[in-house]
Amino acid sequence: MKKVFDLSSEYHLSETQIESFRRNGHVYLPEVCSPDEVAYYREAISRIAWQNFPQKKNDERPFLQTLNLRYHCTKVMQFALSARLGKIVSDLVSKPISSDPNKKSLGIRIFHEQALFKEPKGSLTPWHQDQYYWPLATDQAVGLWMPLVDVPLAMGPIRFATGSHRNGFVKQVSISEQSQGFFQQFIDEKQYPIWHQEMKAGDATFHNGWTIHGASANQTDKVRSAMIVTYYPDGTRVDQLSNPSRVNDAKHFLGGKQAGDLADSPLNTIVHYS
């Protein structure tokens, strides 16, 4: 019988890792999934992703993207809704630590998941803030980025402007050449250090929704495949639908909820509660 990897076991975070996430707006966690676990999910994610990626060829695009694959594949559903990933997010945003003793644990909901594949020689991913897109009225929304293959620096792993989440919303600008230029100047002016490093398949980063981030070009002849999942605390309300992307996201990923509504549609399963 083929072994099933349901990601139900816990990944234990140190206080240092939790403090680093809150201070820097991102944290790197090694081997969140083991090599066997990554192999178990990679085949299904890759197969469903390639079936759903846009067919039109565009050599200038920074990545191939398709969302909510979990409704096409049980394995992707298992991955995105896994207790392990939900518990990590809960610990990062709510677990009491010595310097923050009054924080309480809380439920964590999924916003959406997506496959992001950067093709060989694919261009850089411009600097941007995810929460420009996410209509979530919280500063505790969290994005997971996990490579499904080993990603050396030449392949374009994710990179972060450390500490940039503390600015919150910066500007109404979507991911583009314009956002790359604007945020690069902003990063330079604020003198934010840039974090990036090579990652193994199954390693993961978690980042705050306001953390400025992007990725360099894929200079290799291999596809950089990664899985992204976005989570937020239960009790969050829908934020202002202040741009077309937020209108679209509320429609497709929050079940048509409107500004001020609780973000608790049937699409937004609670993946962890304590």
Predicted regions and their residues:
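Non-heme Fe(II)-dependent double-stranded beta-helix
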Residues: 1-24, 29-127, 133-135, 173, ...
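Non-heme Fe(II)/2-oxoglutarate
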Residues: 6, 51-55, 61, 204-206, ...
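Active-site region of the double-stranded beta-helix
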Residues: 106, 131, 136, 146-157, ...
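Generic beta-strand structural signal
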Residues: 106-108, 112-113, 123-125, 140-146, ...
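A short secondary-structure junction signal
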Residues: 123-130, 138, 154-160, 169-173, ...
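Short, surface-exposed loop/helix-turn segments at secondary-structure junctions
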Residues: 129, 177-190, 223, 242-248
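A short beta-loop-beta micro-motif enriched in histidine and acidic residues
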Residues: 130-141, 192-193, 199, 222-223
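Double-stranded beta-helix
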Residues: 151-212, 236, 260
